[in-house]
Each structure stands twice: as structure tokens, then as C-alpha cells.
């Protein structure tokens, strides 16, 4: 039983799919007929709101745009009918220079149905109806959101619809958008009468001609020659009339196809020229970008070279500064010879102070001087510096015990020989007027040691 129900449901689904396919084919076929009728009518008169062909075309287009359109779900879960304007407003909002915003702001058009009808008229006057439909079909996500499965805009017939509407760009429409008649709630009805005309085929025409000839031949046996001639003339006239009708019909079809193809070619040429211009602009932009990148790369390479040169200069400068600092510190430290001379002068002075005041032409012996020199050399030894400092302090204490008066020139001798202040005080001792250098006295030509 379950399998039987599944079979019935599958059959119902297939039947519903076939019905939807038939609906789509019928709608697209009627739309093509309506477009051709509008093109034919536009050759003789201006198309406006009162034209029967235009009213029928608008009804067909509303049926196509409303085919299997989803309803709007309310807060309570009920589904209310929706107008196709909601879909057009969402799907065509990104079309450049669109009329969507101006229709939204129209004061005399308030309902969604009226705005949708106003949009159709404005798009026809702008000759952009096919462009709007194509843009809406490209937004497949929005189309799927607004239409159910099996809708014409979701099928293969949607592309045929956009191509069919291109032919309307050759017509100059003129409408009044005052809102009168746009808010009618009556259901739109498609009039199929103009498309149900009887068209005689070529086979039926030939059979009619054969029948006329047969009737003429049968009547000629019992009739006069005049009646036979009249029958033949009527047959010829009917044949020529039927031929002219066929030629006129073919001419109209070819003319319509030519207009359609010319409009299609113009549209494709416009699209091609636009694509070519966009391609040129992109190529120019790419060239400019490559040039700017190349210039930027060259500038960065120059900056890198300059930074490398500056880094080399800074390294060399740092090396020279280190060398200069090392030589400067080396030069500031006194040489061993200068230290020996200063030590000799200091030891000689201390020896003279211990033995008594200097007398003119009174000098120590050479043995004493050599002993003093050896003493001064040993005083520079870091191990014996402390001992020498203690001897100096003892000598100074001996001067105080003898009641000697301290002079400013002798106060610099109280420190240790290891400090820089003591070395500087030795230089001041040489220029003092109270102390004389023993080396100068010894090398004077007028004095001899006793």
C-alpha cells in the first residue's frame, strides 16, 4: 500500500511538472506573438496606454513575472499574495542609472501593483526593459528567494524572454504616469483572440485550386465558351491572390526577423564596444601599475644602496673614534722617563730637607746622587710605593718637629706619587722661586760639586 501511494505521488509530481512546462511554453509563445504585434502596430500609429496590443502585452508580462511567485509570510504564519515589484526592486537595485528609486518616490503611485506597472511603462520609454530583466535573472540568489520551483524565471525560457524583449527597443512609447488605472485590483486577463486567426496552409490552397479547376472543367462540358473563360479567369485571379497573400505573409515574417536581428546585432555591438573599452582601460591601468611598481622598486634599490653606504661610513667612523680614543688615553698617561725625572727631583728635595737648608756652592757627592737615583727608581715600583709614601710622611713630620714653616710650594708633595695630582705638582715645583732643580744646578758650568 505504501509503495502504491509512493507511485501515485510520483505520478502526480510528474504530471504537475508537465503542466508547469506547458504553462511556461505557452506564456513565452504568447509573449513573442504580443511583441510582434506591437512592432507591427508601431509602424502605423504611436503606442500608448489605450492601445489594445499594449494592454495585452502588459497583461502577458505581468503573468510571466507573477508565475509561481512566493507569497509574503506574515507574523502569524499566513501567506499573503505579493506583487512582482518586490522582486524587481531587490534584483534591479544595482543596475546603473535605474529608475527604481524614482518610482519608489512617486507620490501618486502607492501600492506595489501600481509601482510594478509604472516600472514596466518607464522601462519601455527608456528602452531598457530587456536590460532590467537580464540584470534580474543574473541575480540568481534573489530569484530563487522570490520564486518557487518550476517558475518561468527559473527555467530555460527566461533567457528567451530577455531576447524577445529586445525587439521592443525599436518602438517609441509614450505613457502618462499619473496613477490613473494603475491601482486597479481586477485580475489581468490575456486576450488570445488576436493569436487564434485561421491561416490557410499551402497544401489547402493547392487543393482548393485543384477543386476550382475540377469544377471549371465539369462545368465547361455543359456550358458555353464564355462561362468556361470566366471560370478560368476566376481561377487565375484566385491563384494570383493566394500567391500574393503568401508572399505578403513571408515578407512580414522576414521583415520582423530582420528588425529583431538588427536590434540584437546593435545590442551585441554595444556590449562588444563596452567590453573593448573596459579591456583597454584595464590594460592601461595594468601598464600604469607596472610602471609605478618599477619606479618604486628602483627608488627602493637606490635607498638600500644609500643606507649601505651610510652604514659603511658609520662603521669606519666608529673604528677611527675607537683608535683616537685609545691613542688619547695612551698619551694622557705619563711616560716612564718623565716619572723617573720627577721622582729624582722629589727624592733630592726630601733629602735636602732632612739634612738641612741648601747652601750656595754646596752639593752632595756623586755617590749620594747615585743612591738618590736608585731610590727614585725603586719608588716607582707599585709594591714599594706605600713604603716610599710612609718615608715622605716621616720626613714631613721631621720638618714640623724642627719648627720649619710650611710653604705653599711644598703642600703638593704630601700626596702619593701614584696620583695624577702629585705628578702635576712636580711640574709646579720646577718653576717655583723657592726650589731649584738639582739637575739644573749640577749641569751649570760655574758650579762644581764639593
UniProtKB/Swiss-Prot annotation:
Coiled coil spans: 291-317
Which InterPro entries does the protein's record reference? Run_dom, Run_dom_sf, RUN_RUNDC3B, RUNDC3A_B
UniProt signal peptide: none
Enumerate the residue ranges of region (Disordered): 203-225
Please state every residue range assigned to the domain named RUN: 48-180
Going by the UniProt record, its keywords in alphabetical order are: Coiled coil
A single Pfam family it belongs to is RUN
The text of the family note is:
Belongs to the RUNDC3 family.
Q: What is this protein called?
A: RUN domain-containing protein 3B
Amino acid at each position: 500500500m505504501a509503495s502504491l501511494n509512493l507511485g501515485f505521488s510520483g505520478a502526480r509530481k510528474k504530471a504537475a511538472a508537465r503542466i508547469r512546462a506547458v504553462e511556461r511554453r505557452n506564456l513565452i509563445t504568447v509573449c513573442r506573438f504580443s511583441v510582434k504585434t506591437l512592432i507591427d502596430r508601431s509602424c502605423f500609429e504611436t503606442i500608448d496606454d489605450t492601445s489594445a496590443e499594449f494592454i495585452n502585452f502588459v497583461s502577458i508580462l505581468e503573468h510571466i513575472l507573477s508565475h509561481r511567485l512566493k507569497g509574503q509570510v506574515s507574523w502569524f504564519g499566513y501567506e499573503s499574495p505579493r506583487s512582482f515589484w518586490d522582486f524587481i526592486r531587490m534584483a534591479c537595485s544595482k543596475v546603473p542609472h535605474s529608475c527604481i528609486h524614482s518610482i519608489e518616490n512617486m507620490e501618486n503611485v502607492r501600492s506595489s501593483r501600481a509601482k510594478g506597472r509604472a516600472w514596466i511603462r518607464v522601462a519601455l520609454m527608456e528602452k531598457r526593459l530587456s536590460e532590467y530583466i537580464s540584470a534580474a535573472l543574473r541575480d540568481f540568489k534573489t530569484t530563487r528567494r522570490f520564486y518557487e520551483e518550476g517558475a518561468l524565471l527559473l527555467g530555460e525560457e527566461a533567457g528567451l524572454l530577455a531576447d524577445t524583449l529586445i525587439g521592443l527597443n525599436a518602438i517609441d512609447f509614450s505613457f502618462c504616469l499619473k496613477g490613473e488605472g494603475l491601482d486597479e485590483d481586477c485580475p489581468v486577463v490575456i486576450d488570445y483572440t488576436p493569436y487564434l486567426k485561421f491561416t490557410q496552409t499551402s497544401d489547402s490552397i493547392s487543393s482548393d485550386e485543384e477543386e476550382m479547376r475540377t469544377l471549371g472543367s465539369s462545368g465547361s462540358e455543359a456550358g458555353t465558351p464564355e462561362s468556361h473563360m470566366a471560370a478560368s479567369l476566376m481561377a487565375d485571379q484566385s491563384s494570383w491572390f493566394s500567391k500574393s497573400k503568401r508572399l505578403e505573409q513571408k515578407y512580414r515574417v522576414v521583415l520582423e526577423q530582420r528588425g529583431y536581428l538588427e536590434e540584437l546585432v546593435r545590442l551585441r555591438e554595444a556590449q562588444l564596444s563596452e567590453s573593448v573599452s573596459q579591456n583597454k582601460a584595464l590594460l592601461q591601468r595594468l601598464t600604469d601599475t607596472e610602471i609605478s611598481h618599477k619606479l618604486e622598486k628602483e627608488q627602493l634599490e637606490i635607498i638600500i644602496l644609500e643606507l649601505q653606504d651610510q652604514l659603511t661610513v658609520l662603521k669606519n667612523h666608529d673604528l677611527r673614534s675607537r683608535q683616537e680614543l685609545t691613542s688619547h688615553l695612551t698619551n694622557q698617561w705619563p711616560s716612564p722617563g718623565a716619572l723617573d725625572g720627577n721622582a729624582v727631583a722629589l727624592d733630592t728635595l726630601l733629602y735636602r730637607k732632612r739634612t738641612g737648608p741648601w747652601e750656595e756652592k754646596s752639593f752632595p757627592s756623586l755617590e749620594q746622587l747615585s743612591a738618590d737615583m736608585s731610590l727614585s727608581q725603586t719608588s716607582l715600583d707599585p709594591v714599594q710605593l706605600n713604603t716610599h709614601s710612609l718615608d715622605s710622611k716621616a720626613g714631613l713630620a721631621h720638618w714640623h718637629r724642627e719648627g720649619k714653616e710650611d710653604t705653599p710650594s711644598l703642600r703638593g708633595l704630601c700626596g702619593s706619587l701614584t696620583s695624577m695630582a702629585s705628578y702635576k705638582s712636580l711640574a709646579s715645583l720646577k718653576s717655583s722661586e723657592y726650589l731649584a732643580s738639582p739637575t739644573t744646578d749640577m749641569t751649570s758650568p760655574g758650579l762644581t760639586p764639593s
